[in-house]
């Protein structure tokens, strides 16, 4: 499946920061270390030189990837007209058949982070949720079989886990 080119504004900024950090901070340090290691003589048995060159290749590969990727990514900001329906960037609280609640945020594939409960817009769950609204039922084909979710809440700002369900976090 093709990778979407959508990203949230904060996701784009994070990738841009990573690019600048690698290019302006980490690469010069590693380049200097490699230069110093090369000055020590025989490079064939010089572990610092060998591993430094390897790290430099990794940095250069990541820098090339980020530079190219940032050129094609499209920043998607929430639109007030989206309220009430699930679209890119939404935080969605769902409940499954076992009455277990889960929260997902629909983000671009470059932002996917299970620890944050951020799922790719290209994932089966996200594709099933797009365009739906509160009280809608969605069925998703997963590697473990079908999963059914009911949409309980949709937001375009983070949920506050410490507040009761459906309480507005601005209060």
Swiss-Prot record:
GO terms for biological process: DNA-templated transcription elongation; regulation of DNA-templated transcription elongation. Pfam families: GreA_GreB, GreA_GreB_N. InterPro entries: GreA/GreB_C_sf, TF_GreA/GreB_CS, Tscrpt_elong_fac_GreA/B, Tscrpt_elong_fac_GreA/B_C, Tscrpt_elong_fac_GreA/B_fam, Tscrpt_elong_fac_GreA/B_N, Tscrpt_elong_fac_GreA/B_N_sf, Tscrpt_elong_fac_GreB. Keywords: Coiled coil, DNA-binding, Transcription, Transcription regulation. Residues 53-75 form a coiled coil. The keyword Disulfide bond does not apply. It comes from the Bacteria. GO terms for molecular function: DNA binding; RNA polymerase binding. Signal peptide: none annotated. Belongs to the GreA/GreB family. GreB subfamily. Necessary for efficient RNA polymerase transcription elongation past template-encoded arresting sites. The arresting sites in DNA have the property of trapping a certain fraction of elongating RNA polymerases that pass through, resulting in locked ternary complexes. Cleavage of the nascent transcript by cleavage factors such as GreA or GreB allows the resumption of elongation from the new 3'terminus. GreB releases sequences of up to 9 nucleotides in length. This is Transcription elongation factor GreB.
């Amino acid at each position: 499946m093709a990778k979407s080119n959508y990203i949230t504004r904060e996701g784009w900024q994070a990738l841009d920061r990573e690019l600048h950090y690698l290019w302006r901070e980490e690469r010069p340090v590693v380049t200097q270390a490699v230069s110093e290691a090369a000055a020590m003589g025989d490079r064939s048995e010089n572990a610092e030189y060998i591993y430094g060159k390897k790290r430099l290749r990794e940095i250069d590969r990541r820098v090339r990837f980020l530079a190219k990727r940032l050129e094609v990514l499209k920043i998607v900001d929430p639109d007030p007209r989206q309220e009430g329906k699930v679209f890119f960037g939404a935080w969605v609280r769902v409940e499954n058949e076992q009455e277990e609640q889960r929260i997902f945020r629909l983000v671009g594939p470059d932002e996917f982070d299970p620890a944050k409960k951020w799922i790719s817009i290209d994932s089966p769950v996200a594709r099933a949720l797009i365009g739906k609204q509160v009280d809608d039922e969605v069925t998703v084909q997963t590697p473990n079989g079908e999963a059914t979710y009911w949409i309980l809440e949709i937001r375009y700002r983070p949920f506050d886990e410490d507040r009761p369900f459906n309480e507005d976090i601005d209060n």
